[in-house]
Amino acid sequence: MKKTTSLLIAALAVAPLAHAAEGGFVGGLMYAATDPVTFVAFLCMVTFLLIAARMGAFKTILGGLDTRASNIRKELEEAASLREQAAEALALAERRAQDADKEAEAIIDQAKRDAKAMLEEARRDLAEKISRREAQAAARITRAETEATSEVRRAAADAATAAARRILSEQTSVDQFEAAARDIERALS
């Protein structure tokens, strides 16, 4: 009933304006409510509205508006739900990004530790190789010294033997010379 009353009031306000637009109130001497044309138009409109109200036209219109309002309300609720889901998805994505950053940092740290370990191992291997090569070089030097000493001794022995043969051959007989040469060779060898 309240809605019907508000519609009637709206009709009363609009009717004089419509009549004035058509050229009513000639000279402005007459008030709109006392004009018979306006009054008849107003009665026709009120009658039409009452018949429409009895037939349920306003219920249909209001039902459609209520349906539209409920649909809009559902869409708003759905939009709010979608917004919450989007916020949750964003939070999840941010957490995953943070986890990925932490994992990347952990991988980088592990790679640095592995690189340090590999560097230390390479240094140890290099030091071991250098030590082995130094030992091999020292062994070669010792062998070379031993061989050189042996060659010098042989050369000295050969020279001493040759000198002794010369001296003995000049001073002794052949048998004594041969025996002395054998003794010298045995002693030097």
From Swiss-Prot:
GO-annotated molecular function: proton-transporting ATP synthase activity, rotational mechanism; proton-transporting ATPase activity, rotational mechanism
Top-level taxonomic group: Bacteria
Subcellular location: Cell inner membrane
Keyword Nucleotide-binding: no
Keyword Oxidoreductase appears in the UniProt entry: no
HAMAP family reported for this sequence: ATP_synth_b_bprime (MF_01398)
Family per similarity comment: Belongs to the ATPase B chain family.
GO cellular component: a single term: plasma membrane
Gene: atpF
CDD domains per UniProt: ATP-synt_Fo_b (cd06503)
Pfam short name (any one): ATP-synt_B
Protein name, per record: ATP synthase subunit b
